[in-house]
Amino acid sequence: MTQTTAAKEIHRIAMRSANDINDAIAATIGRGSVVVTEQDLCPEFFNLRTGFAGELLQKFVNYRVRLAVVLADPNAYGERFSELVREHATHGAVRFFRSEEDARQWLSS
């Protein structure tokens, strides 16, 4: 799903592998931002030991594509994951939200 807001596009893209991350970056670099929900992410994203979350977040930061991650309850994934969410509370490129509406509002700003 794509939403256009004042020359910005917000894309909803599933990211379950490194290839998906690269495809998402290629599709949106310079043209938009991405919102993902828990259902759009693989289980490895929530297990920080796999490195998948770090790779995903770092690529979005490096390529300056804004990413909003929607999670109903970040605490459900453990203390370390909750710390990651808190660390990104004011981040300029990657943030976590409890609702897709809040995520899209931030991406549109």
Feature map (PLM): residue ranges:
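Amphipathic, Lys/Arg-enriched alpha-helical "gate/interface" segment within cytosolic domains
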Residues: 2-109
